[in-house]
Regions:
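Hydrophobic faces of well-ordered beta-strands that scaffold small-molecule active sites
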Residues: 47, 137-140, 163-167, 187-191, ...
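Conserved, mostly hydrophobic/aromatic
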Residues: 3, 44, 68, 107, ...
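Metal-dependent enolase-superfamily TIM-barrel catalytic cores that perform enediolate-based chemistry
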Residues: 125-235
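Shared catalytic-loop signature of beta/alpha-barrel
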Residues: 66, 205, 211, 219-339, ...
Length: 362
């Protein structure tokens, strides 16, 4: 089966997070931009992927169509790992992180979806043995900066069936509100790289009091694995990291430096499904659990479920807790009894209805 065409489709989806106005990269943040990748084959099969977008969507879209697609059109797709390696080698001079890898990731996911459909098998069956099809989920909250809203959103998440919550707060009163709203259930904290080593260490007693399941990316830069390794020992709190890392190579550095308790690869950033599959294997061989970063609503979310099915160690699936105008997969809007179930269809498992999404195309 050969690749006939590759197209990047950008959707701008209004959302509601239930809080105050948010400024993101200098603008009011009112919509999410999704870069959806459509691959068509010579057998008439369509595969769907997702590349990281947000405010970088224009650059990623150009990279998909002008850098990645020309290297793949007409190629046989029986050996996707080989194609992935060819892409990475051909494009490495443009960087091994960021726009280039986001573009590769989206296309690679679409290739696996198409291949799975051609073979009438879900992606996880093309890669290995399924170990699980039901995954614990957590509600990943917006950064609100308001203790009252945070406590309310935590309680709302629990009412919706989630049994674990992640905050994106940095102020003590906001973190305390999250713990109050979550009760004794698991609470994670993603700070998005705001602090120095000294600032993080100064918060040790407070953070320990919060009984965090993990502390995520406390320091800048996120690739300062030497500092993370020190904090992992000194804080006595599990450290998680990885949403800002790309390729198996960078995760090997992270793990070999004993920087983390949990790794958090993002399938729409790291290089796609096979790259993340290699990361999972390496992490689990080194007794590190994978807690995938998946604050996404499109094919990237389903790709994560396909990979989670192959994990031998326990995991959590992240769900960005906000309402978008039109769900890609309505059955996955909320966790059922705190869990998500792996879809059973070929490829990614299910297809979205593009007719319902097309009005958001830009």
């Amino acid at each position: 089966m050969k690749i006939k065409s590759i197209k990047a489709i950008t959707l701008s989806m209004p959302f509601n997070h239930g809080g105050k106005k948010v400024i993101f990269h200098g603008k009011e943040w009112k919509s999410l931009e999704f870069n959806i990748v459509k691959v068509e084959t010579d057998k008439g099969i369509t595969g769907w992927g997702e590349a990281f977008g947000y405010t970088s969507w224009k650059s990623v879209k150009i990279a998909i169509e002008d850098m990645v697609a020309p290297l793949l059109i007409g190629k046989d797709m029986a050996d996707i790992p080989k194609l992935l390696l060819t892409l990475q080698k051909s494009l490495h001079l443009f960087g091994r992180y960021g726009i280039t890898m986001f573009a590769i990731s989206g296309v690679e996911i679409a290739l696996w979806d198409a291949l799975g459909k051609e073979k009438n098998k879900p992606i996880h069956e093309l890669l290995g043995k399924k170990n699980n099809d039901l995954f614990k989920a957590y509600s990943s909250l917006f950064r609100y900066g308001d203790p009252k809203i945070i406590e309310q959103k935590c309680k709302q998440s629990l009412d919706d069936g989630y049994q674990a919550i992640k905050l994106h707060e940095i102020e003590n009163d906001c973190i305390e509100a999250g713990r109050e709203g979550t009760g004794n259930l698991p609470l994670m904290l993603d700070t998005n790289c705001p602090w120095t080593y000294e600032e993080t260490l100064s918060k040790k007693e407070f953070l320990k009091k919060m009984k965090l399941t993990w502390l995520e990316e406390p320091v800048y830069p996120p690739e300062d694995y030497e500092t993370l390794a020190k904090l992992k020992k000194e804080l006595e709190i599990p450290i998680a990291c990885g949403e800002n890392a790309c390729t198996e190579f960078e995760f090997k550095l992270m793990i070999n430096q004993e920087a983390v308790s949990y790794v958090q690869p993002s399938v729409i950033k790291v290089g796609g499904i096979y790259e993340m599959f290699k990361i999972i294997k390496f992490a689990e061989t080194n007794n590190i659990s994978v807690m995938p970063h998946t604050a996404y609503f499109g094919p990237g979310f389903l790709a994560t479920l396909q990979l989670a099915a192959l994990m031998q160690r326990d995991t959590y699936i992240e769900r960005f807790y906000l309402d978008i105008d039109q769900e890609f997969y309505p059955n996955f809007k909320k966790a059922i009894n705190g869990k998500f179930k792996l879809p059973s269809g070929p490829g990614l498992g299910i297809d979205f209805d593009y007719n319902k999404l097309s009005k958001y195309e830009i």
